[in-house]
Amino acid sequence: MNNIIDGKALANEILADLKLEIQELTSHTNASPKLAIVLVGDNPASIIYVRNKIKNAHKIGIYTVLINLSATIHTNDLISKINELNLDNEISGIIVQLPLPSSIDKNKILSAVSPSKDIDGFHPLNVGYLHSGISQGFIPCTALGCLAAIKKYEPNLTGKNVVIIGRSNIVGKPLSALLLKENCSVTICHSKTHNLRSITSKADIVVAAIGSPLKLTAEYFNPESIVIDVGINRISSNKIIGDVDFENVQSKVQYITPIPGGIGPMTIAFLLKNTVKAFKDSLYTLDT
C-alpha cells in the first residue's frame, strides 16, 4: 500500500535546492553559511542527532562548528559561550542541542541566543512573531517539516479539522499557529485530555507528538486520516519507534509518516533552510 509519506525523499528535494542556492550565494561573496552547534554533556541520542545535522550540512555546503561542553557547566558560563557565538560574524546560525542537563536553566539559555541566529525558533521574540502572525524571524523546524509533509499530499488545508496531540514549544504550539494561518480548525490535545480517541477519530489530520511508544492504534483514526507521527521513542541503541502503531495503522488511513524516515529528515532539512535564511539576512545586513 503506497500511502507512506516519504520524509527522506521530501527532505532530499529541499536539500538539493538549498545546495544550489548556497552555490549561487557564495559565488558572489567571500562569506559562507556557518552553523554553530552547542552540545552540553554526552547524551547518546543527542550525539546521534548532532552527527546527522553536521553530515547533512556538509553535503550542501554549510560549514559547522561543534562546541562540546561538560554537563557540569553552569548556566552563566554557557550563556557567556553563546554570547561569543552571537558576536562572531562568521556564524550564521546557532542551535543549542536539547535536552540540557537539569541543572541548567533552559529558558535562560534559549533566550541568550541572538534572535537573528536562532534558527531553532525558540527565542521568545521569534515565538512572539509566529503567534502574532508576523512574517519575521524563525519558526521551529519540526513544525515547518510537519506542515510541508502535510501540504505535499493535501495542498489546500482550508477548513480541515486537525488534531495535534502534544503541546510543546517545539511541535504542538508552533504547528498550531502555522495551521491556523492555513485556515484549519485546530484542536490541541495532551496527556490529560479525556476521550482522546473520540476526538482524533473525527479528524482529517492527526499529528502525534506525545512521546508515548505505539500509543495510537487504528481505532484512533478514520480511513481518510492523514497521520503525522513526530514521536521518537528509542527502545534500543539502534531502534526507534513512533507514537503511532505504524504496522497496524498504515492500511487503515489515507497517508502516514514512518519512523524513522518521516518527520526526522524534514526537521533537519528545515533547520538547514533556516540556516541559509540567517546567512542571507546577514549578507543583507552587511550590505546596508
Swiss-Prot record:
GO terms for molecular function: methenyltetrahydrofolate cyclohydrolase activity; methylenetetrahydrofolate dehydrogenase (NADP+) activity. GO terms for biological process: L-histidine biosynthetic process; methionine biosynthetic process; purine nucleotide biosynthetic process; tetrahydrofolate interconversion. Transmembrane segments: none annotated. Keywords: Amino-acid biosynthesis, Histidine biosynthesis, Hydrolase, Methionine biosynthesis, Multifunctional enzyme, NADP, One-carbon metabolism, Oxidoreductase, Purine biosynthesis. One of its GO terms (cellular component) is cytosol. Pathway: One-carbon metabolism; tetrahydrofolate interconversion. SUPFAM superfamilies: Aminoacid dehydrogenase-like, N-terminal domain, NAD(P)-binding Rossmann-fold domains. The keyword Hydrolase applies. It catalyses: (6R)-5,10-methylene-5,6,7,8-tetrahydrofolate + NADP(+) = (6R)-5,10-methenyltetrahydrofolate + NADPH; (6R)-5,10-methenyltetrahydrofolate + H2O = (6R)-10-formyltetrahydrofolate + H(+). InterPro entries: Aminoacid_DH-like_N_sf (IPR046346), NAD(P)-bd_dom_sf (IPR036291), THF_DH/CycHdrlase (IPR000672), THF_DH/CycHdrlase_cat_dom (IPR020630), THF_DH/CycHdrlase_CS (IPR020867), THF_DH/CycHdrlase_NAD-bd_dom (IPR020631). Its EC number is 1.5.1.5, 3.5.4.9. NADP(+) binds at residues 166-168, 191, 232. It holds the Pfam family THF_DHG_CYH. Coiled coil: none annotated. Belongs to the tetrahydrofolate dehydrogenase/cyclohydrolase family. Homodimer. Catalyzes the oxidation of 5,10-methylenetetrahydrofolate to 5,10-methenyltetrahydrofolate and then the hydrolysis of 5,10-methenyltetrahydrofolate to 10-formyltetrahydrofolate. This is Bifunctional protein FolD. It comes from Rickettsia peacockii (strain Rustic).
